[in-house]
Amino acid sequence: MPIAQLYILEGRSDEQKETLIREVSEAMSRSLDAPIERVRVIITEMPKNHFGIGGEPASKLNR
């Protein structure tokens, strides 16, 4: 059972997350020759002040 664990910054819509799950699942199924029903995708949303880019919190960088 292939599992993808994705970390993204908070703020994406449910529709965007659904698209991400679908497209990652399709890519994993295709590239690993695994039935899509066996693919799992876990999304962890992080607050922008819990993620750093270039030594600064993403919240300060307007990301």
Swiss-Prot record:
It catalyses: (2Z,4E)-2-hydroxyhexa-2,4-dienedioate = (3E)-2-oxohex-3-enedioate. It comes from the Bacteria. GO terms for molecular function: isomerase activity. Keywords: Aromatic hydrocarbons catabolism, Isomerase, Plasmid. Pathway: Aromatic compound metabolism; salicylate degradation. One of its GO terms (biological process) is salicylic acid catabolic process. Transmembrane segments: none annotated. The active site is at 2 (proton acceptor). Disulfide bonds: none annotated. Signal peptide: none annotated. Gene3D superfamilies: Macrophage Migration Inhibitory Factor. Belongs to the 4-oxalocrotonate tautomerase family. This is 2-hydroxymuconate tautomerase. It comes from Pseudomonas putida (Arthrobacter siderocapsulatus). The lineage of its organism: Bacteria, Pseudomonadati, Pseudomonadota, Gammaproteobacteria, Pseudomonadales. The gene is nahJ.
